[in-house]
Amino acid sequence: MINSSKIIIIGGGIVGCSTAYHLADLGHEVCLIESGKLTSGSTWHAAGLVGQLRSNANITQLLGYSVDLYNRLEEETGLSTGWKMNGGLRLACNEQRWK
């Protein structure tokens, strides 16, 4: 597969996996190389939180896309993502943030 692929991605963290997924979705033949288990490095140690509201509209839209993708990824690929929709609570740490 490496010899026939025009795109080779090294690293199976969230960025490598996402890049491979989106390029393959566009019809490219992609080979992803990972020395261990997918997402088992730095990606695994991250909190995995996907908050949906930010102060910037573009980032909020990107996070919304991420939530939609995680909701359908397991069905599309047949691979378990471990995605769970949980709530969250943000507290104002001072009076200015409260306003």
List where the protein language model places each region:
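Dinucleotide-binding Rossmann-like beta1-alpha1 core, especially the glycine-rich loop
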Residues: 48-99
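Glycine-rich FAD pyrophosphate-binding loop
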Residues: 24-44
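A structure-centric signal for secondary-structure junctions around beta-strands
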Residues: 4, 27, 44, 85-86
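Accessory recognition modules or surfaces
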Residues: 2-4, 8, 40-46, 50
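Glycine-rich nucleotide phosphate-binding loop and flanking beta-alpha elements
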Residues: 16, 39, 97
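A secondary-structure boundary/capping signal
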Residues: 10, 34, 46, 85-87
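Beta1/beta-strand and adjacent pyrophosphate-binding region of the FAD-binding site
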Residues: 1-15, 31
